[in-house]
Regions:
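Structured core elements
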Residues: 7-8, 17, 99, 167-169, ...
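Noncatalytic alpha-helical scaffold of FAD-dependent oxidoreductases
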Residues: 2, 25-26, 136-139
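Core beta-strand elements of the Rossmann-like FAD/NAD(P) dinucleotide-binding domain
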Residues: 2-4, 175-183
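A generic beta-sheet turn/junction motif
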Residues: 24, 172-174
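N-terminal Rossmann-like FAD-binding beta1-loop-alpha1 element of flavoenzymes
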Residues: 5-31
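Structural detector for helix-capping/boundary residues
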Residues: 11, 153, 182-183
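Conserved N-terminal/central alpha/beta ligand/cofactor-binding core
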Residues: 34-172
């Protein structure tokens, strides 16, 4: 059985973000993905990302728009987290080098879409935001020496001990492999 400090399963935006966040705290992390690193649902996502990151906007306004568009079906706490932390993540990824669409002066472009009261939808590569995001963030992950990547590994099961996840049981090239994790 191999051992790692922390394991993250999945190489979409959530998994890549988690791996980078863990590595940023000084911990080693193993990122496990069922295909090539860039092959995820994020890669195929089209459209843009709504984020209240501009001076004429605020996450609370974004939350109000989301609640109104949801016609009472949205969880207010989840909407608050999404609009507040989502804006923070978009700023972080823009600063880290994700190639969001920009004008001739280098300002991030934004559009007014759907039920938004402010122009807050940003794109990368036009309508290929997911592809650009996945490629850019995957490159950041590959360059990070604290992140070990295991590609083409199918997650068969979680290893649970004492009610806590203690690792993952993987299928790699037809062979079973257990990867123990401290966290």
């Amino acid at each position: 059985m191999s051992n790692t400090e922390i394991v993250v399963v999945g190489a979409g935006v959530a998994g890549l973000s988690a791996a980078l966040a863990v590595a940023g705290t000084g911990h080693d992390v193993t990122l496990v993905t069922k295909a090539e690193l860039v092959e995820s649902n994020t890669y195929h996502a089209q459209g843009g990302i709504a984020a209240a990151i501009f001076s004429d906007d605020d996450p609370k306004l974004h939350a109000a728009d989301t609640m109104a568009a949801g016609h009472g079906l949205c969880d207010p706490k989840a909407v608050d987290i999404l609009t507040r932390e989502g804006a923070e993540r978009v700023r972080e990824f823009a600063a880290a080098g994700v190639h969001f669409d920009r004008d001739a002066h280098g300002h991030m472009l934004r559009g007014l879409e759907a039920a938004h009261s402010r122009a807050r939808v940003v794109h990368a590569g036009g309508d290929a935001t997911g592809k650009v995001f996945e490629l850019d963030v995957s490159a950041m992950v590959r360059k990070n020496p604290r992140i070990h990547i295991i590609e083409n590994a199918f997650l068969k099961d979680l290893i649970v001990r004492g009610g806590h996840i203690a690792g993952v049981h993987l299928l790699i090239d037809g062979q079973d492999k257990d990867l123990a994790a401290d966290r």
